[in-house]
């Protein structure tokens, strides 16, 4: 007689053995699901307990033989020096997006500067004066972005990330620190005590990478047109790079900056030419455009101190009495140059140079130096200034 099951009707439906097994499996799965649902925590605790027992058994096995290796060194989060470490750098393609008329969002990564080690505590290569203020028109921080930002009135940073990439061996001693200060006019930290008090800070060995994510907000600020008296009102803040504890002043790494910034309200293009003028007493009377360099003078030396890296064309003239002598210091290399001396009255110069790291200084030595006018702009080596 065949096995049957009864339905709502009075008719009988024959069921095979295969169908009966399927029905039993479905019922068993439903029951198991309910058991796991009601006893899930107990099952997890049992599995953890079983794992602990197995781990202890492995440690006890072999008597007093050492099963684990203990390393003397750091606490949790410490990084052991590898034999070698490297990083492959891939080019970044800028992205432009815009959802509303009159604005554009720019996303890109730029090279900021080479980092040199130092024995004592040093910030931004020893250059003081709020070097890396976070503003799209700050030519000392950005080399590519100002050409676009100069066409807009306001900005909002959506994200900013500093990335330190080492280029030294793992035997290099010292420390590299990158930090963010919300006040763009605060003086640079004077020592390690002040540095340690920054809330947004990353420190690392020269051979280890580090990334610093800068906190941003949604506030619209004005782009720096060099006529602002209070930079706190227009800057998101300022960045800083500190080094200390090294054995020398060799290059140890590079700093890159990645950002996403939204620019608002197109305007006539702002100047990208830096102009600095000194009066007869040597006082600064004109400072317009990006702060690529600082200009100062004594009666015998005209000094131009760079505040940014890259390739520049410098042109200028100054009153003096005798022929001039060129002087270079730091990571500056002259690509082409023309100097014209008008003995007894003044001298003029045109220099195409590349600055690889800070500090870098160009000087002219003469006598009777008084007033001076110096222009500086980013360029390429093809902008040859030599006289044919």
Swiss-Prot record:
The keyword RNA-binding applies. It is found in: Virion. One of its GO terms (cellular component) is T=3 icosahedral viral capsid. Residues 1-102 are annotated as: R domain, interaction with RNA. Residues 56-61 are annotated as: Involved in encapsidation. Keywords: Capsid protein, RNA-binding, T=3 icosahedral capsid protein, Virion. Residues 265-388 are annotated as: P domain, projecting. Its main location: virion. GO terms for molecular function: RNA binding; structural molecule activity. SUPFAM superfamilies: Positive stranded ssRNA viruses. Residues 103-264 are annotated as: S domain, virion shell. Pfam families: Coat_P (PF22402), Viral_coat (PF00729). InterPro entries: Capsid_prot_S-dom_vir (IPR000937), Coat_P (IPR055068), Viral_coat (IPR029053). Homomultimer. This is Capsid protein.
